Amino acid sequence: CLVGSEMCIRDRDQAVRRILTVKFELGLFDETYGDPKLVKKVVRNAEKVALAKKVADESAVLLENRNDILPLDLNKYKSVAVVGPNSNQAVLGDYAWTMGDTKEAVSLLQGLQESAGDKIMIRHAEGCDWWSQDKSHIAEAVEVVRNSDIAVVAVGTRSTYLGRSPKYSTAGEGFDLSSLELPGVQEELLKEIKKTGKPMIVVLIAGKPLAMPWV
């Protein structure tokens, strides 16, 4: 918005109003630390969880759809390769992360497995991590793709809570990158998979802008 414009002031007022409303509902203006019993009533109730899912669903943006490959028709394929560092990583945002046993979110791999059931074979390999120059697992991912009818490749960044686990993070508070390109060897992973000639869907899961004009 334009500084000083009526729209800018209205937008700021709305943002502040939302924050203050939640604080009032949590009792933070009556007690410094509020009432812990109110948290699930105000923040983690069914309505708020449903809203969070709706926001996540609507955040997906389709950049390109060559040959109408999307939406993915699982009835057309006998096997799907799900690869990439973000293929089995459920991402909640820059101020939260998930573990392998979480019930708070569903990864791309888990979602496809649940959707496919026993109808098709789902093969998985990460191929590389988010940040390092380790290429030793790319060949494994390429082989998984060769043995499948189509590849779904999830690349991007990884966020953690308040700068924790910096070795494995490439986005979020306190994580700046020197380039807008995909971190690590993810670009090479994509190019090697492309060489297989198999149909390929690229899913970008990122907490910051990335330049990928070649995809």
Model segments located where?
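A short small-residue
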Residues: 5, 34-42, 170
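Single conserved hydrophobic/aromatic residue that forms the stacking wall/gate
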Residues: 1-4, 9
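C-terminal non-catalytic regions of proteins with extracellular/luminal or membrane-system context
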Residues: 5-6, 21, 50-215
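Metal- or metallocofactor-binding catalytic centers and their adjacent structured scaffolds
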Residues: 44, 48
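Conserved, charged catalytic cores of large soluble enzymes
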Residues: 17, 21-39
